[in-house]
């Protein structure tokens, strides 16, 4: 089944998430290396539960997208803006590149840039924030590269095998965002 192209980048596009992809997401969540970077690391995920989560996110007006490689229709992950607060114009960003063969290739960076552009210029958000665990160095570097700033820490928030790690809070303000690709549509 073909994905609908909502936000198109150079190498990827973001498409509305499809409930039928829940099985693939569950297989990715079962991978401990990937799952330990997510907030749901300690939970079992079934296809039915993932379908329910995706349905709830769509119903609750979360902006959740599949990340798909251009010209291949290959699903490699998902990203979202959730907990949207239209009064204070803020939302939380989440991203997962589930296909490990696509790690360290810039797909996550491109997806985040598309999502920021959409959040600031279409949804009219002022603040997009996220959380990342300090051991997830790849993600932390990506967020810094895109322009997120560290704004605080929840110290020793995650304990794995007796070792304690901070949860890092980062955000990005609309006034700091300069990389709009969507502006080409509105000249």
Describe every region a protein language model picked out:
Residues 1-51, 176-187:
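A short, well-structured alpha-helix characteristic of acyl/acetyltransferase catalytic modules
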Residues 121-131:
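Conserved GNAT acetyl-CoA-binding A-motif
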Residues 129-132, 149-166:
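Conserved catalytic-core motifs of GNAT/GCN5-like acyltransferases
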Residues 143, 148, 170:
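Conserved active-site tyrosine of GNAT-family acetyltransferases
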């Amino acid at each position: 089944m073909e994905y609908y192209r909502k936000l198109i980048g150079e190498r990827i596009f973001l498409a509305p998430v499809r409930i039928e992809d829940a099985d693939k997401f569950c297989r990715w969540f079962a991978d401990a290396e990937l799952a330990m970077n997510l907030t749901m690391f300690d939970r079992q995920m079934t296809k039915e539960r993932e379908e329910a989560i995706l349905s709830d996110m769509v119903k609750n007006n979360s902006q959740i997208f599949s990340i798909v490689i251009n010209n291949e229709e290959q699903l490699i992950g998902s990203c979202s803006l959730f907990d949207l607060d239209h009064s204070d114009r803020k939302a939380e960003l989440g991203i997962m590149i589930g296909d490990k063969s696509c790690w360290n290739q810039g797909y996550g960076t491109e997806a985040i840039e598309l999502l920021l552009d959409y959040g600031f210029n279409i949804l009219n958000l002022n603040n997009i924030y996220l959380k990342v665990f300090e051991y997830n160095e790849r993600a932390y570097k990506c967020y810094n590269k895109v322009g997120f700033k560290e704004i605080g820490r929840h110290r020793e928030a995650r304990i794995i095998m007796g070792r304690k790690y901070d949860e890092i809070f980062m955000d990005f303000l609309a006034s700091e965002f300069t990389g709009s690709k969507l502006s080409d549509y509105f000249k």
